[in-house]
């Protein structure tokens, strides 16, 4: 299973996309810190901020586990409120990375010696 890992650099405001076949990411949760060596960024430390599964359902930090659930939402990730007081039931993925996750969003917490550099790869 291949993961697309998007690394966001808060200093420059740019994002970089990498692909990895690593199974070291399975079982990690939103908020966990991982080594940048998973995506060939030696010396970097990355924090998992979210992701989505193969069907496009977003991960949510307050749903524990790796399963997909239909939850009633009034705000937050996975739902944009159109009117005040409006609630809606949405399908979302839990906060744990499993084999069904295809996209993982991360941000840089600790920088390595080499610059991130290069242009972000386009998603096709």
Curated annotation (Swiss-Prot):
A GO molecular function held by the record: structural constituent of ribosome
Pfam families referenced in this protein's UniProt entry, alphabetically: Ribosomal_S6e
Entry-linked InterPro entries: Ribosomal_eS6, Ribosomal_eS6_arc
Record keywords, A-Z: Ribonucleoprotein, Ribosomal protein
Keyword Ribonucleoprotein: yes
Protein origin, superkingdom: Archaea
GO cellular component: ribonucleoprotein complex; ribosome
Stored SMART domains: Ribosomal_S6e (SM01405)
GO biological process: translation
Cystine crosslinks: none
Family recorded in the similarity comment: Belongs to the eukaryotic ribosomal protein eS6 family.
PANTHER family: 40S RIBOSOMAL PROTEIN S6
Name of the molecule in the record: Small ribosomal subunit protein eS6
Gene expressing this chain: rps6e
């Amino acid at each position: 299973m291949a993961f697309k890992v998007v690394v966001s650099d808060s200093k420059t405001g740019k994002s970089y996309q990498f692909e990895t076949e690593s199974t070291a990411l399975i079982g990690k949760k939103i908020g966990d810190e991982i080594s940048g060596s998973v995506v060939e960024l030696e010396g970097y430390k990355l924090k998992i901020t979210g992701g989505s599964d193969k069907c496009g359902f977003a991960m949510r930090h307050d749903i524990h586990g790796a399963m997909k659930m239909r939850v009633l939402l009034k705000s937050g990730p996975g739902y944009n409120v159109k009117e005040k007081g409006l609630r809606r039931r949405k399908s979302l993925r839990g906060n744990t990375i499993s084999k069904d996750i295809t996209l993982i969003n991360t941000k840089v917490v600790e920088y390595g010696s080499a610059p991130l550099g290069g242009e972000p790869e386009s998603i096709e």
